[in-house]
């Protein structure tokens, strides 16, 4: 029995020793932290260094620091592993309360501290959370305040409401409630419809710097509400747009399919297989083509569409932009009878009936023009006759360039006559015509179709052009019967283009004169100083060539002028001073005509001519020698015309600017150069008499002569038309008055006759004698001239020519003082 008792005491003693040993190794790892709900309970939590049975091994003692206060013991509870928690019961907590805390492990004190509840407040969690879903699509959440109304925290709590979706934990939201009422209203539309949601709430007291309370128990509800009209409208608009787009696409596809299967099968002229002939270049003159700058601007496609859609609005602007008469106004050198220049269409389209056996498109190009004459000139003299392509590029300039080129061409043609006359300078052919006995001889004026007995075409028609030179003179020609001189060209319709260069520079020799009288066909007046017309037995005729346009004539003359090499013996300028012209004109004129000494001047002052005429008053006409004067006073020419029925108009002192071509081959015979023929034949003009220069010993000062001649020319002639100023007195009552020029009022002869072509002379008088040959010697004698000079020359008028008696101008008061001045009354 004793042995059994001793065996039981040994294990008990081991357990006691083990407990004592283990109690000595317990330590607090995290000191206790205490919070109060500021009502009746405070909660403390801590952690031990190892797993501990908190309820059996640890004790927490707390006591209010106040007189006669009693100490209280709290048995802790395990809070997950080594953690322990203990709830302290307190009565009516105030802000001044302060407690002491002691943690014991058996007989061992593990931790000692103090705790003030007013400084560590954690409100209680709200309760009774409820969700109301039947309030007009609005969610109402309500909960209860965890404190009674008499508590200090009752009116100082704020709340936070957490709502989340059960299906999607990420879909959660928190609403802060800062007002005192424990409720929250939210729109049901803010949440998804048809989904279950949960909500919970917690409280926080800001005045005591508290922490958030624990979450209240959650509540669940199913969110289902009626969607608003705005959302239905947005959805309806979206669906409607999609439907409209689908309908439009369906209609387009349907119409396209119907058009392809039904509408396109209807015959349409636009899709008919027709032949289109495209003319690349117009079959016209290069002068009629528009330049690149004058090409009308291409109308854009959108403007064409607008024109088709709105023709009434755009028709006025289109008509205003198109000005077809503008080009005709700007076209220079156009006669009165010629129609206005119209632009030529570069591209044309001709539609033919449908044909299967022909090609659909044929392009035609303009063939190069074959000009044998221009090729010969180019081979011999280096002409600049360009190819059609280069010519097309050259004439594609602006309208101003064309005007300038035409003006330059006219000046070149007019200036070229002073060096070449009617013959090419580089061609050694003579201007002299065959004698009268030759059957193949023809006169220079026969080259012009309008001259001669044939009926001349009207002024508005175009004349043909010849490039063949005149036939050279026969070896059997007699120099006594032929006399050749330069024939200047004058445009009577435009005084601005009178050949002023003919008065400055003369051709040096007759062999330099070219057989090119072609440009004179389209000019108005031709003045031969001494016509090279031989005595012909019978006139010959020239066949009528093919007509050409005036543009082609002008261009060909320009090409011929540029091709001429112009090898002159004495280089002269087109424009020279009048003094040099006086000095050089005598040598050149005497070399060409051979009527005077080589040192005499071709242009003399009028005073010197009048003075020198008194030396040899008995000599007159073409038979005068080289020492006789070419310019005679009119009283010297008057007495030699016995039986003249009526006076004729006084010659115009315009330095050869008012002469006209011969009337006809029958009336253009030259008088004999023998001394027996001192008068004028019936077919001659007074102005056509040769003008031999003054003798060398009677030449005056060139400067004085030039000044005197210029003053006389300026005083006697009109600045607009170039004719002599004539006035008629009251004593001319019985005569037919001379018609005044409509441009300047000067008396320029009988202008009442209808206009004719420049190359067609007016019909001669009934007796075959022109009006110029009917000068009356008695009516033309100015005062102050001796009767001896009047009887020195005579005229032989034709009988029956009384038609010119009505055109007698009156010239009086010739005064010669220094440089001769003349006054016309």
UniProtKB/Swiss-Prot annotation:
Residues 678-690 have a biased composition (Basic and acidic residues). Changing residue 208 to A: 500-fold reduction in IL4 binding. Glycans are attached at residues 53, 98, 128, 134, 176, 209. The modification Phosphotyrosine is found at residues 497, 575, 603, 631. Gene3D superfamilies: Immunoglobulins. Changing residue 152 to A: 40-fold reduction in IL4 binding. The extracellular domain represents the IL4 binding protein (IL4BP). Receptor for both interleukin 4 and interleukin 13. Couples to the JAK1/2/3-STAT6 pathway. The IL4 response is involved in promoting Th2 differentiation. The IL4/IL13 responses are involved in regulating IgE production and, chemokine and mucus production at sites of allergic inflammation. In certain cell types, can signal through activation of insulin receptor substrates, IRS1/IRS2. Soluble IL4R (sIL4R) inhibits IL4-mediated cell proliferation and IL5 up-regulation by T-cells. This is Interleukin-4 receptor subunit alpha. It comes from Homo sapiens (Human). The lineage of its organism: Eukaryota, Metazoa, Chordata, Craniata, Vertebrata. The gene is IL4R.
